[in-house]
């Protein structure tokens, strides 16, 4: 019986691989111009409309570190990126553990109520960047002429580089029913995300704007964690929405999710230093593996925050 099981496994694998390959080839027949809503968001143009759009995004970022471009993707774009995410969803690294805001280990020398000692259940999945082919929909959007320049101009950062991490420069977060993603800070300074698919219920994006812009601000972090902060904003992102967010300074989370439909969000990461990659421990937590480059470049960061 075990012998026949081994024989049937190979044909099944080949059929699955062929189906996945055909789907990827089909997705590559379209272009980024069909995926991005260039009528409302002329990011590749040098005109008054683009200037007005930039001014609006900059105001939002200045106010609370978050800007949302509704319906940035076309309907066709949403469908293509969701289909691509579905085709590689089995490659997601699923993790179920307990983490603190900083993804660091417990430090028993600190007071018990210190936010560095507050740990929460985490259930989440990330599809690493090396699963998305160069000509696929996600990377077509990422590499579209004008996309990266628009993001840089919106953020108004003189030092702006695409994240060099081969597992994390552009990924898809796949969140299934459960606790979502608890409160945390991003290790990269600027995060750009595309909402692709919502869960059946829940999954709101919640954040406390810029609470550690001038320092760690442990007191306000504690208030967010215990539910007494008045700084928390709740945001409902719809499929196709583009979000620019300063996650290095703003504590944020994905609220608990409900239902069988996974929540897909594409994440594009940019940083202030060239050649930056994730810290080995954080990378292992999020993607289930590290590459030699993570060990070689460990510690390459300009700021002094604890994560």
Please tell me what each predicted stretch does.
Residues 29-52, 62, 71-146:
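Non-heme Fe(II)-dependent double-stranded beta-helix
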Residues 67-73, 236:
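Short amphipathic
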Residues 89-93, 155-159, 274:
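A generic secondary-structure signal for well-formed alpha-helical elements
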Residues 18, 54, 144-148, 189, ...:
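A structural signal for well-ordered alpha-helical scaffolds and beta->alpha junctions
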Residues 134-139, 148-242:
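Catalytic core of non-heme Fe(II) oxygenases with the double-stranded beta-helix
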Residues 1-63, 290-307:
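Fe(II)/2-oxoglutarate
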Residues 72, 173-175, 195, 246-248, ...:
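Structured loops at beta-to-helix junctions and adjacent beta-edge loops in soluble globular domains
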Residues 206-307:
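Catalytic core of Fe(II)/2-oxoglutarate
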